[in-house]
């Protein structure tokens, strides 16, 4: 640790002040994530709907939509879906039923736990004030607030990687924490398939670094660490063998290793590197991946003032690593860079958006906090207070925007009003026709169609396919336009649809959020 980092005293160095700030920041971060939870975003995303429906099916019927018992990886759309969030949803669904806020609980809990984890990690690698700043920056970060409030399964990855790193750093002081680190890193493999090649590299580099400085040694805890990781990774290794055709799929009454309809390995390649770097640059510079459900254009992923601080913080961590090498000293701040540097090649393997490269974002937020903190150590400690005040003002502005304009702007993407539209249609029609652009997974979720009924009645547009599109199941039909409207049917369509033919046929219309329902009274 540099001398400058040790020479901060005054009001913010008082233990009572820092404890108060810790609880204030944690409370503000949790409030930003739980206020109107389940209502904003208002509606349901197709992937979280599928994860929730699969959890409900596994809980009540013992199989998923592909007929597998407890699969290690969900078949879902045809080309697969990460399974951990689905399994984490099951206890909440068992307690409270299949509801939107219920299936978002795992993401909320992991996000809230990430706040004290970031504090504790940076406190141990730098110091307490830096830890408070890291926690504060993550607590108010637009990207992290947004991901915490809906249930995209891939967005669990940053949290579990953070937990894995935190317990690994603790293991340098007490080897017993290696067991928890192995558990967190092992679980991270079930959050996002894209990180499979990178997690072993992250772990290996951390092991080499700590063993080089004699912070870890060959012991029973290290052996257990490796054993736990191997056991947790083994089902996924078998999954790869199954899907590359080396062994048959595995079906048992306890768990399954499925053969997917389509393996998306072709999505990972080093082709079009220039285009991928351009996309990455756009995300880092504009902080906008053009997907409003990930990145609010008005404020950016991390606020637009953040990247210079992040660059400064990255330089600080690299500097710590270099100083440690020269002096042959253990510098735990060096490990903060490992996940970021190892994750960078990911950007060359796929076309980036905020979800696909999400493992880079918590390190970026921590770097930004360290950049602001280190700037205060080489200038004046009040600089950190000033920076925090600017961010607090941005946070207040973002919160107002998030619960007003942003809520309105995202409603169509989350199919706001579809649940109510389906309820009306169920009362008014024997058959229900739904606009073909609607995702069938949302209909499954809201109607809670038994999985055996779905499996026995579903008709797909193309089968097999990497992204299955249902034409119909049970009494639900996904149609282009009502060429010849049926009197006994109800029609659900976007609110801006052409209704001329239905009006001519004497249909009645009811409006629900982004949808309208057309039907004939008494089916006449």
Language-model segments: residues:
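Membrane-integral, polyisoprenol-dependent glycosyltransferases
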Residues: 3, 8-245, 278-376
